[in-house]
Amino acid sequence: MRLLAFFFLTAAVACGQSLAGEIRLEVKDATGAGIEATGSIEGLATGVHRDYRTDARGTRTFTGLPFGTYRLQIGRDGFAAQSVRVDVRSEAPIQQTVTLAVAVIATTVEVSDSVTLVNPQATSAAQYIRPEELRDRESGAPGRSFIDLVNQQPGWLLEANGVLHPRGSEYQVQYVVDGIPLYDNRSPAFSQSLGVDEFDSMNVRTAGFPAEFGRSLGGVVELNTNHDAVPGLHGQMSYQAGSFDQQSGFASLQYSRGRNAVSLSGEGFSTDRYLDAPVEQNYTNHASGGALSARFDRTWSAADSTHGYMSSRHTGFLVPDEQLQQAAGQRQDRTAGETLGQVSHTHLFNARVLMQVRGMVRDTSALLWSNSLSIPILPTQDRGFREGYLGGSVSVTHGSHELKAGADSLFDSIHENFGYLITAYKIGTVRIFDRDVPQSFQFSGQRDGRQQSAFVQDQWHKGPLTLSAGLRFDHYGVVADETAWSPRLGAAYSIPKAGLVLRASYDRIFQSPAMENLLLVSADLSAQLGGGAFLPLRPSRGDYFEAGFAKSILGKLRLDGSWYRRQVDHFADDDLLLNTGVSFPIAFSHAEIRGFEAKLELPHWGPVSGFMSYSNLLGRGRLPVAGGLLLGDDAQSLVAGAGTFPITQDQRNSFRGRVRVQAHRRMWLALESDYNSGLPVDLNVADMAFLRQQYGAAILSKVNFERGRVRPSASFDASAGVSLYQVDRKSVRLQADVFNLFDRLNVIDFTGVLSGTALQAGRNFAVRLNASF
């Protein structure tokens, strides 16, 4: 009882979100003296592989290790090598001492790779992006590298402009950077994207969420900037160039001495294809941007450490024109910026109790400007928000229990200014706006909001059985005042002789509405917009169910399979203002989504590695619609409507695959492919002659108007990399990528004239040079 009382009282004053632990290695000889050693740490199930060298005292700390099983290899000339198994199950550091014996009298101890291939305690599937995949990733378009990596995972798909959709969800993607959550849309069209070069590890999950995760639970992407501190000065640089006049660069420096480590990084880019163009000509699609960031780590003692991170990012880009807009001379400029600072402190009370406290402040902004030749609408926007975050958690290891409790608060100050001027109600014979829509409109709003949460969770291990349970409380107080209790349950059963883990999970979810244009869509402006109908936006509530398995095959491959079902009230989606890229959150009264996912992964088998993944999804939404910028007659039909329909992310079949071959110790080759069966089409213009004039016969041939879907798309990419120089930590690598190898015309979305139609880029290439020391 005293332990539980301490647990909850400390949590009340101390919720960082991180499912990662730490191993503190100490290597000794037979006399007990510390000795310098080298080796590697590997976890095939968690995608971790790091080579290391201890210091002269034989110590080395490995941070940011996702929960799972690891193999530590330790060696030194004149001593027998050893490999040991270490299970990381909590955030509390694990002290691992290894004694090396003289080679002539020692017996080598080995732990096979297959031990780490399947995580026997995982109650849900989580996809871990290996360091090799981060390093040798395709040279994606600016702002899309980490988005493309997530899109390779089962259950995820991309709509126009790099917007990620996990298991049919719109918006509800949570990004956790060093344990601090970011809930707003991070796609290029919405905000400044995160650069992948500054991150050391990445993992993705779509179910089995511990109670510490909340507010946005379509899917969670965890990004970690932790690097194991290596004494001295180190750095890396990269330069990328390719089609569409693309150029980008990244550089970072890290210096570590004693208990301190500091790093600085910067990046910049310029391209003539930033967003997904609506027509093949790729009109007005230029963008440029940059970012600066800094990190500071201080280890005060074996029990205390502090981490700080700051970044500033800014992007300016043009909105791609369609044919008639280009002919009219339209130009629309958008900018997105973010400045962020965060700090965290970890205190280890003893080997079983760990406390973490985190804080963050950030300021984001988004602007839209249109020239006088914009058609059929001239929109303007100036929005942003300032956000403060404060949270803490306490983790306790007690026998077979891994307990954790915590609380956090978000403090938001939101401002929005939006306006439009209609410059054409009709284009030719095609009506774009109803006559009762006012020609001009202006909105200005400001509001402070608060969100609070608290949680408690436990994971219990007994032999082959793992059980997890948690309870979360949320209060939302921005545009509504609602509370929710959300239980979470999970179970896993391991059958080691069969290399099989069976698992199941249940998540009750409570999700906040998206931040973009939130004040506008929450105000009843129907009388000013010619609609006469309005429903207020509310948080989403729902239930997620999943059952699945993980199977080791021949000790080399891992097969993951998951069946899932989601039932959500007030299902979040978005309402795009024609093709401006300005989006307004909406919610359908209810949605049900079910599907199956599978992934076959080969971490490495000799020179070969790779994966194949398949996703099947069926999603139906139900009217009416709340929120949004609903103009004219659309408001009545959507707000007062009834019936069901395919959700906008209802893509039945998706396939992803990649194979990589280490053809030579200095050269590798890779092929990557993807297939998408096609998204639903919401056609707002039935005049086929007009559509043909705007898009051409080639694009229209990619749309099945009878079925109301985009026709299937497929793409093949090829990559090659060569190590030009490699000595210890110094390396120079060159990589070349060719995308859409067969130059296939792929339509991502087709929603009619001026309403967000998007095309995948044709055949293009990129070359990237990397250097590190």
Identify the role of each PLM range.
Residues 14-127, 140, 181-183:
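Periplasm-facing N-terminal accessory domains of Gram-negative outer-membrane beta-barrel systems
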Residues 356-360, 366, 494, 536-594, ...:
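Membrane-embedded beta-barrel scaffold of Gram-negative outer-membrane proteins
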